[in-house]
Each structure stands twice: as C-alpha cells, then as structure tokens.
C-alpha cells in the first residue's frame, strides 16, 4: 500500500512582499502614476498657472524633509501644523461623540423625545459649519475654543442621527423578551440596546470624523494661528502654490488615516455578522 503521505505537498511559504504585488496596491499605484503624468503634461507648458509635480517637489522638498521645524510664531513645519489641527479635531470630535451617542440613544429609545427633538435637529444639521463660527467667536471671544466648537457642531449631527436610527432598530421580540425577563434598565442597555446600535454608531463616527477634518481646515483659514488651514491660506497670500498643493496632499492622507482608524476600532468592537 502506498504511503498516505505520498500525495502530500509541502506548503508554500508566503512571500512577505506578496502584498506589494496585490491588486489593492498595484491598481491605486497605476492610477496615481497616470494622474501624475497627466498633471505633468498639463502644467509643463507655457502659460500654466499651476506648478507641475516636478516643480512642486523641487520647491517643497525642505518642507517634506523637515516637517517639524519651528522658527517661532506661525512659521512651523507641516508636521506641527497638522498636529495642531488634529488636536482641535480630537477635542471637538470626542465631545461630539460622547454627547451625540448619549443623545441618539435617548432619542431613539423614547418616541416622545424623538417627536420633540428630531425636527429641531433636522433644521440645525443643515446649517453650514462655518456659519456657526461668528456665533462661537461672539460667545467665546477666543479663536481656539471657537474652532473646537465648530468641530463639535459639525460632527455631532451624523453621530446623533445614526445612533438614533440604531437605537430604533432593536427587534420587537428582543423588547418583549426583556420585559418577560424583567431586565433592569442597565441590563437592557448593555445587553440589547447598545449592541444593536453599535454598527450605526460607528457609521456616524466615520462620517463625523471626516466632516470634522474638513471643517477645521476651513475654520483655521478664518481664525488664523497655527494649523494646516491657516498654513494653506498664508501660502496662498504669499503666492506659494506648491506649498498649497503639498499641504492638500497631506490633508488628504490624514483624512484617509482618520477614517481607517475609526474603521479599525469598528472591526474590534462590532461582530463580523453585524457589519
């Protein structure tokens, strides 16, 4: 009798570089390369008002190589500028997450609260974030807390609305079981309501963090000081278009990383079958 192991083949070792050659890497890389080539062609001719990729790299490589220089005042590297903006976003978004989740669960759990507050929230959420900035400056009298308030008011609405929807998705059978078992309010919240709402909460958080990053860049252009938004505006006033472009690239990368960070937290908290 032939050995039962005769047909077995040794397992192939995974190439640690295989990810680099995967479609998820190659396709975006090709798209970026095509974009750069088109950009280079369009902006290399005479009369172009925008720099080409090569010119951007030549004019901004000191900023890229030394992102944390500090010459005092607002003359700081891109790393410091982005960190200042991220700090404001972290404070405003964290406050919006706490308040928004609490409000959303309260409204989604009570028909009375939903009927009373939903029309008000639907009106307030349509107000552009920057429209709140003059009100915040008038009330708080300082630029820093005003910028944080703009972040808060920007992020809170998607969090409230999505959490409310999630709290309303608890199946009626679950509610009936909780009554039969005479679960306490805390038991009902932690075992039934919150798990049902978690996927919706993270949807609101992902939308909120993206809007927060958009809003702080715009708000900093108006309030001044250290921050990536004011850096872009100051570069425009100085006709440093290459610096604007490299800053926009950094803004986009940070926005992507923020979204991926919330998605990573979601993968740790939300069971796969609920996604």
Curated annotation (Swiss-Prot):
<dbReference type="GO" id="GO:0005886">
    <property type="term" value="C:plasma membrane"/>
</dbReference>
<feature type="domain" description="ABC transmembrane type-1">
    <location>
        <begin position="82"/>
        <end position="262"/>
    </location>
</feature>
<keyword id="KW-0406">Ion transport</keyword>
<feature type="transmembrane region" description="Helical">
    <location>
        <begin position="25"/>
        <end position="45"/>
    </location>
</feature>
<keyword id="KW-0472">Membrane</keyword>
<keyword id="KW-1003">Cell membrane</keyword>
<comment type="subunit">
    <text>The complex is composed of two ATP-binding proteins (NrtC and NrtD), two transmembrane proteins (NrtB) and a solute-binding protein (NrtA).</text>
</comment>
<dbReference type="Pfam" id="PF00528">
    <property type="entry name" value="BPD_transp_1"/>
</dbReference>
<protein>
    <recommendedName>
        <fullName>Nitrate import permease protein NrtB</fullName>
    </recommendedName>
</protein>
<keyword id="KW-0812">Transmembrane</keyword>
<dbReference type="GO" id="GO:0006811">
    <property type="term" value="P:monoatomic ion transport"/>
</dbReference>
<keyword id="KW-1133">Transmembrane helix</keyword>
<dbReference type="InterPro" id="IPR005889">
    <property type="entry name" value="NtrB"/>
</dbReference>
<feature type="transmembrane region" description="Helical">
    <location>
        <begin position="89"/>
        <end position="109"/>
    </location>
</feature>
<feature type="transmembrane region" description="Helical">
    <location>
        <begin position="213"/>
        <end position="233"/>
    </location>
</feature>
<dbReference type="InterPro" id="IPR035906">
    <property type="entry name" value="MetI-like_sf"/>
</dbReference>
<keyword id="KW-0997">Cell inner membrane</keyword>
<feature type="transmembrane region" description="Helical">
    <location>
        <begin position="147"/>
        <end position="167"/>
    </location>
</feature>
<comment type="function">
    <text>Part of the ABC transporter complex NrtABCD involved in nitrate uptake. The complex is probably also involved in nitrite transport. Probably responsible for the translocation of the substrate across the membrane.</text>
</comment>
<keyword id="KW-0813">Transport</keyword>
<keyword id="KW-0534">Nitrate assimilation</keyword>
<comment type="similarity">
    <text>Belongs to the binding-protein-dependent transport system permease family. CysTW subfamily.</text>
</comment>
<feature type="transmembrane region" description="Helical">
    <location>
        <begin position="189"/>
        <end position="209"/>
    </location>
</feature>
<feature type="transmembrane region" description="Helical">
    <location>
        <begin position="238"/>
        <end position="258"/>
    </location>
</feature>
<feature type="transmembrane region" description="Helical">
    <location>
        <begin position="120"/>
        <end position="140"/>
    </location>
</feature>
<dbReference type="InterPro" id="IPR000515">
    <property type="entry name" value="MetI-like"/>
</dbReference>
<dbReference type="GO" id="GO:0042128">
    <property type="term" value="P:nitrate assimilation"/>
</dbReference>
<dbReference type="GO" id="GO:0015112">
    <property type="term" value="F:nitrate transmembrane transporter activity"/>
</dbReference>
């Amino acid at each position: 009798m032939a050995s039962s192991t005769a047909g077995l083949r040794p397992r192939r070792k995974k190439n640690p570089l295989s990810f680099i050659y995967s479609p998820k890497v190659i396709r975006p890389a090709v798209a970026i390369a095509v974009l750069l080539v088109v950009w280079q062609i369009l902006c290399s001719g005479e009369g172009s008002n925008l720099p080409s990729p090569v010119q951007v790299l030549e004019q901004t490589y000191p900023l890229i190589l030394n992102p944390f220089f500090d010459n005092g005042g607002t003359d700081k590297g891109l790393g410091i500028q982005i960190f200042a903006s991220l700090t404001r976003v972290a404070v405003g978004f964290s406050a919006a997450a706490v308040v928004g989740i609490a409000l959303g669960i309260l409204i989604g759990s009570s028909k009375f609260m939903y009927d009373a507050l939903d029309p008000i929230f639907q009106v307030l959420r349509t107000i552009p974030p920057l429209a709140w900035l003059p009100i915040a400056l008038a009330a708080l009298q300082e630029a820093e807390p005003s910028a944080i308030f703009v972040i808060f008011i920007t992020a809170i609405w998607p969090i409230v609305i999505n959490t409310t929807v999630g709290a309303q998705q608890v199946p009626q059978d679950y509610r009936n079981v909780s009554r039969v078992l005479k679960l306490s309010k805390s038991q009902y919240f932690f075992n039934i309501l919150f798990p049902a709402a978690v996927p919706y909460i993270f949807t609101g958080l992902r939308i909120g963090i993206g809007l927060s990053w958009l809003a702080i860049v715009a708000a900093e252009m108006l309030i001044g000081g250290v921050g990536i938004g004011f850096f872009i505006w100051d570069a425009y006033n100085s006709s440093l278009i290459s610096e604007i472009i490299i800053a926009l690239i950094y803004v986009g990368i940070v926005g992507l990383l923020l979204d991926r960070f919330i998605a990573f937290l979601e993968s740790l908290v939300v069971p796969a079958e609920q996604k």
